[in-house]
């Protein structure tokens, strides 16, 4: 037997004796027997992964420390959308580095997510107040993709009858790059200048532009209004604390990055973008929206609102494929605003603006030409032929400035900038700054009349802030409390050793456009990761740029699109997608300019190979791609996977392999060997990046050799087709995956996959006598997850799948995935990290719930008044003076057998009213004046 270093044993939940007991329960002599039964022999990898041998936690941290020590951290004045920040330690320690925050899942289950939902609600309130627009989503991926998403909203608003987009000012180059990538397959015409015509869907107004200048856009905005075009403002949220809100001057939408609200640059990410819209655009805004509703007892409660507009419902008709966003970073930004309050934010903004104004004045006095008269934090200077020399001198002094071209440099100030920086930078131009606090921003009209809500005024001491964050997170159930058995989500351990490097100075505080020679640590770390992921998947090339799984899908499909175009077959636009696919699949295909044709599935859950063959042959002249999830979304290894790929290839298409379920394959099989041409990997699932309560995520893609030339490029690297603002996307959290692979090694990764499959089959075995297990493969085995059919409780007792999900909260669990991919069922994925004790506790709870349903069926409890129909039960409900239910208080909150009373989780609210919340949408907190 392979001897595993301590980390492998720490990561995998079941002990050796547990593994033996679970295999015995399945009637199996060994793990190898289980894997032979579950995984088709035709796809098995018959060799060990060629990865570096596993290291201990201490050794891996030391090795990564040496690598990242090659980075040279200098003070950045590059700007271009990325700024130095002071992350308040109270936020870093109590939120960013707190597993109670970062291990939580997207808050679909409202009752166990009230803390992070509340903070995201404050984020939306912050954005609405800054922009003057009434509706904001709970974050997007980055500023560049947010601009593209806003353009998509504008086109949808015009029912796709207008296709021209006018960029009315100079956006950051990376934003233009991403917009151009998005435009090509969707047929958007991207124009610059000030000419608004009848085909213009929207104008995009940078506020300020990439040079730091606030232009005069009054006429083009008036023309847009006259022509019915929407106005999109790309606005700096720190500047908006001292400037007129975009809605005041005509913006219908506003977007930007919240990075400078306490989130480190991280060599490009992750950061939360914002998007706010007018009320008329509410129902086509992309991303999550947190709304306020009430629970069953009339208490205020938060929930995700208007979900029917999202990709998992509307599929290829959705406005966007956005799924995972940047919830953790949005919560950091909200906490930053709560910590500083409006006066503190204005003080930061005014100081930054004053430094920039004094720098501009000094340069002017020295005879240096600068761009524009109105500016906030950035000064762009004309230095004919001297840009490189001046930047080099700044570099020698430990400061980085932006080289725009051979004759132009930019200097951007932020909250970390000092008087010493100002003097040193001015001296590079032969200038000397003078005193003063004048600022040069236009329309300096915003006073104290914003962020008047109490939450932005109540937490000035660290004691108050620490307790505020604790009160919020105590409302939630995350992996630090209990198992989160969500099918297709892979909620595995996010080990402390993996997380620690994210906060290192050499990881967190580099600008993504820093000189290449100063980021050699990142170059080595990302190169390692690309090579390891290639080995794990079998592909020839990897791009780490996509900053979510949905963006990986999009990037992969765009690579296929560009491949066909390069071969003179750009007419290929049909994408075959199984009816069981994730909702992001058809949404991504639509964004990539493809038309979706649905392939049927058989009653046993497998893809109907005859239907696939017929449709592939029917569309052989136009077939672009086939998207398949493997193991299937039903949690089964389909025997015919290689035949599926052959059919697609025989008809001129490419195979897109959705890597959502890669946790069932690592070390056992490789997508490329199976026949895939491209695959995205969810690093926030299989490779241990935490879900953060709804993001960040990372979705790199691996591609076969013929697709390598079509991987996403980046303007900073001299190439095109970027899908994210930064070349390496959410670069700073890639160290998490680096650490995971380095500490597991090839044998450890394979062992983790085997443990995940064992845990899922053990659950299926324990529950199959009570609930039907819907889909199984050969030998009655499942892959790494199983679908439990709770409809038997509906048939016998009227108990719905929602009743079961909410009752599991009383037992201390996050519910499994509900009603997907089959309505009325629960899909359970335990991952390899859960110990047998916790798995048994979940199984005991599910069996006990079936027993409770039987009491309803037998008439012991009424159908409308029983522990399941009334779940979950709060402490206040349980302690009410009157208890009129036919079951006891103990039965409500301390259910026997499966329950550990010492680990009781108390939900803060009872069942939330979802319908009422959508009918009466409240997605930001009204200002204090609204109550007057």
UniProtKB/Swiss-Prot annotation:
It comes from the Bacteria. Signal peptide: none annotated. Its cofactor is pyridoxal 5'-phosphate. The gene is gcvP. It comes from Brucella suis (strain ATCC 23445 / NCTC 10510). CDD domains: GDC-P. The glycine cleavage system catalyzes the degradation of glycine. The P protein binds the alpha-amino group of glycine through its pyridoxal phosphate cofactor; CO(2) is released and the remaining methylamine moiety is then transferred to the lipoamide cofactor of the H protein. This is Glycine dehydrogenase (decarboxylating). It is an enzyme of class 1 (oxidoreductase). InterPro entries: GcvP (IPR003437), GDC-P_C (IPR049316), GDC-P_N (IPR049315), GDC_P (IPR020581), PyrdxlP-dep_Trfase (IPR015424), PyrdxlP-dep_Trfase_major (IPR015421), PyrdxlP-dep_Trfase_small (IPR015422). GO terms for cellular component: cytosol; glycine cleavage complex. Its EC number is 1.4.4.2. The glycine cleavage system is composed of four proteins: P, T, L and H.
């Amino acid at each position: 037997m392979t001897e595993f270093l301590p980390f492998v044993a720490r990561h995998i939940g079941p002990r050796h004796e547990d593994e033996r007991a679970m295999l015995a329960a399945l009637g199996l002599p060994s793990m190898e027997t289980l894997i032979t039964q579950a995984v088709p022999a035709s796809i098995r990898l018959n060799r060990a992964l060629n990865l570096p041998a596993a290291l201990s936690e201490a050794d891996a941290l030391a090795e990564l420390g040496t690598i990242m020590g090659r980075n040279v951290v200098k003070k950045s004045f590059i700007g271009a959308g990325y700024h130095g920040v002071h992350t308040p330690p109270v936020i870093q320690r109590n939120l960013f580095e707190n597993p109670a925050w970062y291990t939580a899942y997207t808050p679909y289950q409202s009752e166990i997510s009230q803390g992070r939902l509340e903070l995201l609600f404050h984020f939306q309130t912050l954005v609405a107040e800054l922009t003057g627009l009434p509706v904001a989503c709970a974050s997007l991926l980055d500023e560049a993709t947010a601009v593209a998403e806003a353009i998509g909203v504008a086109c949808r608003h015009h029912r796709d009858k207008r296709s021209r987009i006018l960029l009315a000012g100079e956006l950051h180059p990376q934003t233009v790059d991403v917009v151009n990538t998005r435009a090509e397959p969707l047929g958007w015409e991207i124009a610059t200048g000030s000419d608004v015509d009848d085909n213009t869907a929207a104008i995009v107004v940078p506020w300020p532009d990439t040079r730091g200048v606030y232009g005069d856009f009054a006429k083009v905005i008036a023309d847009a209004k006259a022509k019915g075009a929407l106005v999109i403002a790309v606005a700096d949220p720190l500047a908006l604390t001292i400037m007129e809100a975009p809605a005041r001057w005509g913006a219908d939408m506003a977007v930007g990055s919240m990075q400078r609200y306490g989130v480190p640059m991280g060599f490009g990410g992750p950061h939360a973008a914002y998007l706010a819209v007018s009320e008329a655009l509410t129902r086509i805004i992309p991303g999550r929206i947190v709304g306020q509703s009430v629970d069953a007892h009339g208490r205020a409660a938060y929930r995700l609102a208007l979900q029917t507009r999202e990709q998992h419902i509307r599929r290829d008709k959705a406005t966007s494929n956005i799924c995972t966003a940047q919830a953790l970073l949005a919560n950091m930004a909200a906490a930053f605003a709560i910590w500083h309050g409006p006066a503190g934010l204005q003080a930061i903004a005014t100081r930054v603006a004053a430094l920039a104004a004094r720098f501009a004045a000094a340069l002017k006095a020295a005879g240096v030409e600068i761009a524009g008269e109105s500016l906030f934090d950035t000064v762009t200077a004309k230095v004919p032929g001297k840009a490189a020399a001046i930047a080099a001198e700044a570099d020698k002094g430990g400061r980085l400035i932006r080289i725009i071209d051979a004759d132009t440099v930019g200097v951007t100030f932020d909250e970390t900038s000092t008087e010493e920086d100002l003097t040193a930078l001015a001296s590079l131009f032969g200038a000397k700054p003078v005193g003063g606090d004048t600022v040069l921003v236009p329309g300096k009209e915003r006073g104290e009349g914003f962020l008047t809500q109490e939450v932005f005024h109540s937490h000035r001491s660290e004691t108050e802030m620490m307790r505020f964050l604790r009160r919020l997170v105590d409302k939630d159930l995350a992996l630090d409390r209990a198992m989160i058995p969500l099918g297709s989500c892979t909620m595995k351990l996010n080990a402390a050793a993996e997380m620690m490097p994210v906060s290192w100075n050499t990881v967190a505080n580099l600008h993504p456009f820093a000189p290449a020679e100063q980021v050699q640590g990142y170059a080595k770390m990302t190169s390692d990761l690309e090579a390891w992921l290639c080995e794990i998947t079998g592909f020839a090339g990897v791009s780490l740029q996509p900053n979510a799984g949905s963006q990986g899908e999009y990037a992969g499909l765009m690579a296929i699109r560009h491949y066909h175009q390069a071969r003179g077959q750009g007419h290929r636009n049909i994408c075959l997608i199984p009816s069981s696919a994730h909702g992001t699949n058809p949404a991504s295909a639509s964004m990539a300019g493809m038309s979706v044709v649905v392939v049927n599935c058989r009653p046993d859950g497998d893809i109907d190979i005859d239907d696939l063959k017929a449709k592939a042959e029917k569309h052989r002249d136009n077939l672009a791609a086939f998207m398949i999830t493997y193991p299937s979304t039903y949690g089964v290894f389909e025997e015919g996977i290689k035949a599926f790929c052959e059919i697609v290839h025989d008809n001129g298409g490419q195979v897109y392999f959705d890597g959502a379920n890669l946790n069932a394959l690592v070390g056992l099989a490789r997508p490329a060997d199976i026949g895939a041409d491209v695959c995205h990997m969810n690093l926030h699932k299989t490779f241990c990046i935490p879900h953060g309560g709804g993001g960040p995520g990372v979705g790199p893609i691996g591609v076969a050799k013929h697709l390598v030339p079509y991987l996403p490029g980046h303007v900073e690297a001299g190439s095109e087709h970027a899908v994210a603002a930064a070349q390496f996307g959410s670069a700073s959290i890639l160290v998490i995956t680096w650490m995971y692979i380095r500490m597991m090694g090839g044998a450890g990764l394979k062992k983790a996959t085997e443990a995940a499959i064992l845990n899922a089959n053990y659950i299926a075995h324990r529950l199959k006598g009570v609930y039907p297990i819907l889909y199984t493969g050969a030998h009655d085995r499942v892959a790494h997850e199983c679908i439990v059919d709770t409809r038997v409780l509906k048939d016998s007792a009227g108990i719905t799948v929602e009743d079961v999900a909410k009752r599991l909260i009383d037992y201390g669990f996050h519910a499994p995935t509900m009603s997907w991919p089959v309505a009325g069922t629960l899909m359970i994925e335990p991952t390899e990290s859960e110990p047998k004790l916790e798995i048994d506790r979940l199984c005991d709870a599910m069996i006990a719930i079936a027993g409770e349903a039987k009491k309803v069926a037998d008439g012991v409890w009424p159908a409308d008044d029983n522990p399941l129909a009334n779940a979950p039960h709060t402490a206040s409900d349980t302690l009410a003076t009157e208890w009129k239910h036919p079951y006891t208080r103990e039965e409500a909150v301390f259910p026997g057998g499966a329950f550990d009373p010492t680990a009781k989780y108390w939900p803060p609210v009872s069942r939330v009213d979802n319908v009422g919340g959508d009918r009466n949408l409240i997605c930001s907190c009204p200002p204090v004046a609204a109550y007057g």
